[in-house]
């Protein structure tokens, strides 16, 4: 049996992209259910799955529904321990979880001022101080992570 992942358009929704990408990257069998993220139908389409009516939402082969990227990651890791979703080493795994949590909850200026739109080329964008601070933090996190997680 396969997982079902409920997402919006991966070109415009980083939340949707994250949910789908975990399944793709680790070759876990899945079926994509696209919901109307921008058509106004998402809340109705998601009502039977998730009280928050947000994407992504995952239905496991057993029928359990899980929302939120990190909860989905944890569920997939538990159900597929050999897939390598998290590092095997406890210290590396803790660092990876920290990075993932900060990615989900942090960088508000970057998300606010730089919406995800993979089909558009932005020219002449001037980085605000807040966005630059987020970018600097990302560089610091990933530079440090390669000594711990990579």
Where are these regions (language model features)?
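Amphipathic alpha-helical packing segments from all-alpha helical-bundle domains
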Residues: 126-146
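Short, structured loop/turn "capping" segments at alpha-beta junctions
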Residues: 107-111, 144-149
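GST-like domain detector, emphasizing the conserved glutathione-binding G-site
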Residues: 1-128
């Amino acid at each position: 049996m396969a997982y079902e992942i409920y997402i919006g358009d991966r070109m415009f929704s980083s939340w949707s992209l994250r949910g789908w990408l975990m399944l793709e990257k680790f070759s876990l069998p899945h079926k994509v259910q696209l919901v109307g993220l921008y058509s106004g139908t998402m809340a109705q389409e998601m009502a039977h799955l998730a009280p928050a009516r947000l994407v992504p939402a995952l239905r496991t082969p057993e029928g359990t529904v899980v929302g939120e990227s990190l909860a989905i990651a944890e569920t997939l890791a538990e159900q597929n321990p050999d897939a390598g979703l998290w590092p095997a080493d406890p210290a590396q795994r803790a660092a990876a979880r920290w990075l993932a949590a900060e990615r989900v909850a942090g960088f508000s200026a970057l998300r606010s001022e730089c919406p995800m739109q993979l089909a558009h080329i932005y020219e002449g964008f001037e980085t605000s101080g807040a966005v630059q601070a987020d970018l600097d933090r990302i560089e610091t996190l990933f530079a440090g992570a390669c000594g711990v997680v990579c």
